[in-house]
Amino acid sequence: MNKIPMTVAGQIALDEELKRLKTIERPAVIAAISEAREHGDLSENAEYHAAKERQGWIEGRVQELEDKLARAQVIDITKMSGDTVKFGATVTVLDEDTEQESTYQIVGEDESDVKSGKISISSPIARSMINKEVGDVAEVNAPGGLKSYEIMSVSWG
């Protein structure tokens, strides 16, 4: 069973989504199915079919979240330190072609949000930075060709 790395914040977000699905979404869709059944012929009842489809999605997502949480390897980044890039690190890099600095935090799959600077541990740029230190150059095979990023700083928390 493969562990899924995530930050404490990532675990909390998945827990909250699971709780919302179980306590709010699931009962609401059951009520919608019940109400749609009262409208008679189910074969041509669009409300019923939409509610059943929504129920299937909710149940699938509940199972997915329960599985991810069961396999979670929660990493408390506030207890980490050092200049080596690892999961949870916030890394400032310098694009050697454009001289533009960017800052990324390396997080779990479900936490990634490029717009807010959070990149997945499995993304090419994150994989290229892992185990590098300040001053090292990470090379990434990007769609436009090879990109080189110098690690400027590594911080935690």
From Swiss-Prot:
Query: One GO molecular function term?
Result: DNA binding
Question: Keywords, A to Z?
Answer: DNA-binding, Transcription, Transcription regulation
Any one of the GO BP annotations? DNA-templated transcription elongation
Q: Per the record, a Pfam family?
A: GreA_GreB
Q: Does the keyword Chloroplast apply?
A: no
Please state which protein family the record places this protein in. Answer: Belongs to the GreA/GreB family.
What does this chain do? Necessary for efficient RNA polymerase transcription elongation past template-encoded arresting sites. The arresting sites in DNA have the property of trapping a certain fraction of elongating RNA polymerases that pass through, resulting in locked ternary complexes. Cleavage of the nascent transcript by cleavage factors such as GreA or GreB allows the resumption of elongation from the new 3'terminus. GreA releases sequences of 2 to 3 nucleotides.
Protein name listed in UniProt: Transcription elongation factor GreA
Organism of this sequence: Maricaulis maris (strain MCS10) (Caulobacter maris)
